[in-house]
Regions:
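Long, highly charged, low-complexity intrinsically disordered interaction regions
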Residues: 228-349
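Divalent-cation
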Residues: 1-266
Length: 349
């Protein structure tokens, strides 16, 4: 997350339902008022305006609501504990770029470019609350709108997780059969990205919901828990460079690629470092993901096993005839490991 994105996330959190600031904003909307509220970087904000009057009074939702009945901006300290100015006329340079059309929103966007303040604009006509940080605006939604979207995303998350679980089971069988194609891997990677995209969308709503989002967060975790590590291991299994550092870079490349492009096996192969590979090209997995799902393989042990054997198939070829080799690596109960892998395969050791 960039610095600007972090600042926007913090600003949205300040306006979440249940906060005094959000209560004031809801009253402003209910009163069919417009408003311009500047939070933080108060020296720079005050330097960019004039007139109005000095207050230095403690912040309450009712006070902010009453002060917004006047035309000018209200200036609040960064911790939202003090109201410093009211009816303050802001004069940011008109040369500061903005695509906003309304006077109040243009001023808000320019003030957020000129200063490090969070600027909140409430449209009197449209009855919309917009938060501005670094020239970018984020339109807040009410709780009913947010919860409607939450329900849609949770259904999508549940369905995608179900598809992903089935695809991973199939992939494990193919890995143990030693016949995995680029197309097989591309399907699973695509589902991982869809799952994480939906989870990211849900995270933004959880942030906007504030305390109201706690139960949503718990439901999100039910569907996403453990998937982050499994995704990284899957990439390491199939990427040309299997290091953790390279996997992080590859994940970022997948994240920046449109999900629909990830349905193209050739494009997925390119991102994994295999130029010219097609849908039916065969890939050999290292086995990190599969081994990590076996209870007797302690954390970090999968890497040692892969370093020793080179691939999952080499391990499968050797495990039945030479279990002592695993014992030498420090694997507890090599027989249980062998039995677990064969059960995944649907066969007996």
């Amino acid at each position: 997350m960039s610095k600007s994105e972090s600042r926007m996330a913090a600003a949205i959190k300040q306006t979440a339902p249940g906060t005094a600031l959000r209560h004031a904003l809801d009253m402003i909307i209910a009163g069919h008022l417009g408003a311009l509220i500047c939070i933080g970087d108060t020296d720079a904000v005050i330097a960019a305006g004039d007139d109005g009057f000095k207050l230095d009074i403690s912040f309450t939702a009712n006070r902010l609501f009453e002060l917004c009945k006047m035309d000018g901006a209200v200036v609040v300290d960064k911790d939202i504990t003090q109201i410093l100015r009211a009816n303050y006329h802001l004069n940011p340079s008109p040369s500061l770029p903005t695509s906003e059309t309304g006077m109040r929103h243009r001023t808000a966007a320019r003030m957020s470019l000129l200063t490090q303040a969070t600027i909140i604009s409430v449209s009197e006509r449209r009855q919309v609350i917009t938060v501005y940080v670094d020239g970018k605006g984020y339109e807040l939604r009410n709780v009913s709108e947010l919860m409607s979207r939450v329900n849609q995303l949770l259904v999508s998350l549940q369905n995608t997780r179900g598809q992903l679980d089935r695809a991973l089971l199939r992939l494990t069988t193919l890995e143990l059969d030693n016949y995995v194609t680029v197309g097989d891997v591309a399907q699973v990677l695509y589902l991982f990205e869809v799952l994480l995209t939906v989870a990211d969308q849900l995270d933004r709503i959880i942030l906007e919901l504030g305390r109201e989002g706690r139960s949503v967060q718990m439901q999100r975790e039910e569907f996403v828990a453990g998937m982050d590590e499994e995704y990284t291991l899957l990439i390491r299994d199939y990427a040309r460079d299997s290091s953790e550092e390279a996997a992080s870079t590859t994940r970022e490349a997948f994240r920046e690629t449109a999900n629909m492009q990830l349905r193209n096996p050739k494009r997925v192969a390119e991102l994994l470092g295999f130029e010219g590979y097609g849908e039916d090209s065969v890939l050999t997995p290292l086995g990190l993901r599969t081994l990590s799902n076996v209870s007797v393989v302690r954390r970090g042990m999968a890497d040692k096993i892969v370093d020793e054997y080179g691939s999952l198939q080499q391990l499968m070829d050797d495990i039945e005839h030479n279990p002592d080799r695993l014992d030498d690596l420090g694997v507890d109960n090599p027989g249980i490991l062998a039995d677990s892998l064969y059960r995944m395969w649907g066969k007996h050791a």
